[in-house]
From Swiss-Prot:
There is a cross-link at K230 (Glycyl lysine isopeptide (Lys-Gly) (interchain with G-Cter in SUMO2)). GO terms for biological process: translation. SMART domains: S4. One of its GO terms (cellular component) is cytosolic ribosome. Component of the small ribosomal subunit. The ribosome is a large ribonucleoprotein complex responsible for the synthesis of proteins in the cell. Part of the small subunit (SSU) processome, first precursor of the small eukaryotic ribosomal subunit. During the assembly of the SSU processome in the nucleolus, many ribosome biogenesis factors, an RNA chaperone and ribosomal proteins associate with the nascent pre-rRNA and work in concert to generate RNA folding, modifications, rearrangements and cleavage as well as targeted degradation of pre-ribosomal RNA by the RNA exosome. This is Small ribosomal subunit protein eS4. The modification N6-acetyllysine is found at K233. It holds the Pfam family RS4NT. Residues 42-104 form the S4 RNA-binding domain. GO terms for molecular function: rRNA binding; structural constituent of ribosome. It comes from Oryctolagus cuniculus (Rabbit). Keywords: Acetylation, Cytoplasm, Isopeptide bond, Nucleus, Ribonucleoprotein, Ribosomal protein, RNA-binding, rRNA-binding, Ubl conjugation. Component of the small ribosomal subunit. Part of the small subunit (SSU) processome, composed of more than 70 proteins and the RNA chaperone small nucleolar RNA (snoRNA) U3. Identified in a IGF2BP1-dependent mRNP granule complex containing untranslated mRNAs. It is found in: Cytoplasm; Nucleus, Nucleolus.
Length: 263
């Protein structure tokens, strides 16, 4: 009988969006326990070694982390398998670079560079609101932060803007039709659009209908929706493609046009 937590992860069972080749070795880095789920996170080692190519091996990543160069959400993280996830800000002081983990339209974490100004805050989705001991209201976010005494106007599924230095809420966006959102799960993962309406299904999953900038409509579960802006103005900078998923034919035409203009 297995006792205790699992310590290994086979490469073939690793999440697809890490984009690890299956045949080079047997194991993949198993993310530590942390604020994001195993299937929805990106361990630091994969970000530094496979995405940024700052290291060739796991040992090199360990040497970088042990020098305390890497900060996630303003805190130094020396664990190479620390699970960074959606909306996290990764800062590398040595190079002066800041990144925000955001999905591209293919549902993978894009290497999205941001300005030092934007690296001071992050957006969090409100997962739960409850009243704790002595009647103190609490709020729990998608990245497992618990904040006491939030603004009473903030409700579930809203998005709050958090100042990373103080951990305090600076602003919030209501979950409402007409606001810009990003899909963080399901088949439409990584798409960005404006919420058009919400279907309530008591006892089942609420469905949200979204329309992207090209006028394409799609629907997804409420739990997959993350509001990122008021009206159609995003509060964060968006990765290349602005969250608009192209069909295979559109992608081909775009590639050919780029080829002709460069050729």
């Amino acid at each position: 009988m297995a006792r205790g937590p699992k310590k290994h992860l086979k490469r073939v069972a690793a999440p697809k969006h890490w984009m690890l080749d299956k045949l080079t070795s047997v194991f993949a880095p198993r993310p530590s326990t942390g604020p994001h789920k195993l299937r929805e996170c990106l361990p630091l080692i994969i970000f530094l070694r496979n995405k940024l190519k700052y290291a060739l091996t796991g040992d090199e990543v360990k040497k970088i982390c042990m020098q305390r160069f890497i900060k996630i959400d303003g805190k130094v993280r020396a664990d190479i398998t620390y699970p960074a996830g959606f909306m996290d800000v990764i800062s590398i002081d040595k190079t002066g670079e800041n990144f925000r983990l955001i999905y591209d339209t293919k549902g993978r974490f894009a290497v999205h560079r941001i300005t030092p100004e934007e690296a001071k805050y992050k957006l969090c989705k409100v997962r739960k609101i409850f009243v704790g001991t002595k009647g103190i209201p609490h709020l729990v976010t998608h990245d497992a932060r618990t904040i006491r005494y939030p603004d009473p106007l903030i409700k579930m599924n809203d998005t709050i803007q958090i100042d990373l230095e103080t951990g305090k809420i600076t602003d919030f966006i209501k979950f409402d039709t007409g606001n810009l959102c990003m899909v963080t799960g399901g088949a439409n993962l990584g798409r960005i659009g404006v919420i058009t309406n919400r279907e309530r299904h008591p006892g089942s999953f609420d469905v949200v209908h979204v329309k992207d900038a090209n006028g394409n409509s799609f629907a997804t579960r409420l739990s997959n929706i993350f509001v990122i802006g008021k009206g159609n103005k995003p509060w964060i900078s968006l990765p290349r493609g602005k969250g608009i998923r192209l069909t295979i034919a559109e992608e081909r035409d775009k590639r050919l046009a780029a080829k002709q203009s460069s050729g």
